[in-house]
C-alpha cells in the first residue's frame, strides 16, 4: 500500500483442551476465543521460522475482501465492535485483556492470532468467525463473510477500564501505538522500515502472526511475539509490554533476516505529525496556535551529547541523517502539554505522548535518520525517524536489535544540562519593542528565539556571563541578546540570520550556551529554509 493511503487508513481509526494442571488457567482464557489445535511454541522456534521464511520467495498473502468489507467507510469500520465476551483473556478476570480488529477497508492482510500457555508452551490459534463481533450498527452483509478472513490487528485493555479504552494497538502493516497516563493516542511506531528514503518505493512489512502469552491474573505486564514478512525481509519479534500507571514500556527483541539487499533499513521507526508550531507558522491559519503530535527529535548521542532538533513542515521533502555510534537514545517528543498552546478540544494535542527509544544492545555505527514530508493539515503523518546501520544490508544477512520503547509524557531520561524549552522564529532586523507602525527595518533578516531552562540555570551566581555559541552553514548570524526568563527559570537567546547570497538551500543552524569554558546546555539544531531573493523584503 502507498504510504499516504496507509496513513489515511490508520488516521481514520485514531478514534477506533487436554492440558496439565499448570495450563488450566490459560485453558479458561482459550474457552472464549482460541479454537485451534494445540501446538508447541517458543521464541527460538519463531526465530528459526523467520529465518527459513527469508530463504524462500516472498508470497503476498493479502486477500481480496468481500465487497461489504472492501467498500466500507471508516465510520462503518469503527462501528464493528468486538464482543467482549470472547476477548482473549475474558475468563481470566485479570488486569489485562485483548480484543481483535476486523479486516476491512485497506486492512487486507489476514493476521493470525494465537494464545500461548506460558507454562506448557502450547499455542492454539484464534480463528476468525462472525460471532466474535457485533455488526448491529453497521451495514455489513454478514452473509458475505465466509471462511477464515483472519484479523487486522489487536488492541489491549487494562483494568479498571476493560472493554472501554484500549492502551495498546497494533493495526496495519507493522504499525503500533500506546498511550500514557492521559489515555490519548498520538504518534506510532513500526516493527521495521524499508527504503523510506531510497531510490525505490518504500516497502511496508507486515506483522502476519501474533502469539500472546497468557499473563498472571494480577499482572499488568505480558509478552507477545510477532512474525514479520515482506518482499525484502522477515523478522521474529518479542515484545515484553509493561502497562504502568503513567506510561507503557515495551522491551523489544528484534531478529531481522534480509531476503534481498536493502538500501535503507530503518530500525525502531516511529511516525508522527507536525503541521505547525511556535517556530513554523506556514500552515497555522486556524484558531489553533499549534498543531502537532511531536515538536522535536531528541537525541542522546553515543558520546554523551544531547541534541534538540525542532521539527518542520517543509515546503519540500527533507531528509537528514545524524551519524552516530552506539546511540544512548532518541525519540520524537511532545514537550508542551498545556491546553492553551493548542486550544484543541477534539484531537487534544496537549495530551499526546512522546516516544523514546533506548537501545539495550550495541547498535554500532549508523545514523538517526529524520524524514520531514510537506503536509497541508493534521490528517496525515509527515514525520518519520529511525536508526539506519552504516554497514550495507545484503541478501542473507541476519541482524539483532534490542531496545526499549517508552510511551510517556516525556522521555524517561534527560540531559543534566539546560534543555531547550521552546523555539520561536519571526521577522528580524529590528530592536525588541519596535512596532510596525513606526517604520520597517531597512535590511531583511530572520529572527530566532531559543529558550533554555533547567540544568541549574536558576542557581548561577548573579552576574554570570552567558555566551551563546552559534554557527550557520550559510549566511551570517549577529545581533545576539541574552534575556533572563523568570517564568521558566532560564534564559532566552535571540539572534538574527542575514543572507549573504541568493541561495535558497536549507541553512543548518547550531546553538548552545556556555559560561567561560563550561557548557551549560544541550545543543539546538535547526534547519531554516530561506525565501527566494525577491521575497526578502518588508512592505
Swiss-Prot record:
GO cellular component terms listed in the entry, alphabetical order: outer membrane-bounded periplasmic space
Gene: opgD
Reported modifications of this chain: Predicted to be exported by the Tat system. The position of the signal peptide cleavage has not been experimentally proven.
Protein name: Glucans biosynthesis protein D
Pfam families: MdoG (PF04349)
Signal peptide: 1-31
Role: Probably involved in the control of the structural glucose backbone of osmoregulated periplasmic glucans (OPGs).
Domain of life: Bacteria
The keyword Signal belongs to this UniProt entry's keyword annotation: yes
Record-level Gene Ontology MF annotations: carbohydrate binding; catalytic activity
Tagged with keyword Amino-acid biosynthesis: no
PROSITE patterns for the chain: TAT (PS51318)
Amino acid at each position: 500500500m502507498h504510504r499516504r493511503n496507509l496513513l489515511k487508513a490508520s488516521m481514520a481509526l485514531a478514534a477506533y483442551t487436554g492440558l496439565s494442571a499448570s495450563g488450566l488457567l490459560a485453558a479458561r482464557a482459550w474457552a472464549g476465543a482460541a479454537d485451534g489445535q494445540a501446538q508447541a511454541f517458543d521464541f527460538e522456534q519463531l526465530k528459526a521460522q523467520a529465518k527459513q521464511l527469508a530463504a524462500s520467495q516472498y508470497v503476498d498473502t493479502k486477500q481480496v475482501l468481500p465487497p461489504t468489507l472492501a467498500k466500507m467507510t471508516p465510520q462503518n469500520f469503527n462501528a464493528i465492535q468486538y464482543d467482549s465476551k470472547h476477548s482473549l483473556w475474558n475468563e481470566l478476570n485479570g488486569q489485562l485483556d485483548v480484543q481483535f480488529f476486523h479486516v476491512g477497508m485497506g486492512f487486507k492482510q489476514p493476521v493470525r492470532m494465537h494464545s500461548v500457555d506460558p507454562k506448557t508452551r502450547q499455542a492454539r490459534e484464534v480463528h476468525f468467525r462472525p460471532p466474535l463481533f457485533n455488526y448491529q450498527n453497521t451495514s455489513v452483509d454478514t452473509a458475505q463473510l465466509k471462511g477464515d478472513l483472519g484479523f487486522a490487528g489487536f488492541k489491549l485493555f487494562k483494568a479498571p477500564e476493560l472493554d472501554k479504552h484500549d492502551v495498546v494497538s497494533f493495526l496495519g502493516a507493522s504499525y503500533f501505538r500506546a498511550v500514557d497516563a492521559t489515555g490519548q493516542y498520538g504518534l506510532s511506531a513500526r516493527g521495521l522500515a524499508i527504503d523510506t528514503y531510497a531510490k525505490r518505493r518504500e516497502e511496508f512489512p507486515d506483522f502476519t502472526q501474533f502469539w500472546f502469552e497468557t499473563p498472571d491474573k494480577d499482572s499488568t505486564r505480558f509478552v507477545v511475539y510477532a512474525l514479520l514478512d515482506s518482499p525484502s525481509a522477515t523478522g521474529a519479534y518479542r515484545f515484553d509490554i509493561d502497562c504502568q500507571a503513567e506510561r507503557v514500556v515495551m522491551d523489544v527483541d528484534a531478529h531481522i533476516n534480509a531476503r534481498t539487499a536493502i538500501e535503507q533499513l530503518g530500525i525502531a521507526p516511529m511516525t508522527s505529525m507536525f503541521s505547525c508550531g511556535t517556530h513554523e507558522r506556514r500552515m497555522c491559519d486556524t484558531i489553533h496556535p499549534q498543531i502537532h503530535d511531536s515538536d522535536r527529535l531528541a537525541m542522546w548521542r553515543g558520546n554523551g551529547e544531547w541534541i534538540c532538533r525542532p521539527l518542520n513542515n517543509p515546503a519540500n521533502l527533507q531528509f537528514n541523517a545524524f551519524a552516530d555510534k552506539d546511540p544512548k537514545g532518541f525519540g520524537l517528543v511532545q514537550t508542551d502539554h498545556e491546553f492553551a498552546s493548542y486550544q484543541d478540544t477534539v484531537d487534544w494535542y496537549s495530551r499526546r505522548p512522546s516516544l523514546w527509544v533506548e537501545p539495550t544492545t550495541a547498535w554500532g555505527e549508523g545514523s538517526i535518520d529524520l524524514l520531514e514530508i510537506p503536509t497541508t493539515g493534521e490528517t496525515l503523518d509527515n514525520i518519520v525517524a529511525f536508526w539506519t546501520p552504516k554497514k550495507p544490508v545484503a541478501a542473507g544477512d541476519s541482524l539483532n536489535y534490542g531496545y526499549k520503547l517508552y510511551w510517556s509524557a516525556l522521555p524517561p531520561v534527560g540531559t543534566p544540562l539546560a534543555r531547550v524549552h521552546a523555539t520561536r522564529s519571526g521577522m528580524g532586523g529590528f530592536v525588541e519593542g519596535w512596532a510596525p507602525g513606526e517604520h520597517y527595518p531597512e535590511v531583511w533578516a530572520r529572527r530566532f528565539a531559543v529558550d533554555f531552562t533547567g540544568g541549574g540555570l536558576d542557581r548561577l551566581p548573579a552576574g554570570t556571563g552567558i555566551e551563546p555559541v552559534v554557527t550557520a552553514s550559510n549566511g551570517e548570524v549577529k545581533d545576539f541578546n541574552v534575556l533572563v526568563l523568570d517564568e521558566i527559570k532560564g534564559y532566552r537567546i535571540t539572534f538574527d540570520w542575514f543572507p549573504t547570497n541568493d541561495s535558497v538551500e536549507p541553512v543548518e543552524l547550531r546553538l548552545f550556551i556556555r559560561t567561560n569554558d563550561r557548557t551549560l546546555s544541550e545543543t539546538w539544531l535547526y534547519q531554516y529554509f530561506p525565501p527566494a531573493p525577491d521575497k526578502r523584503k518588508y512592505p
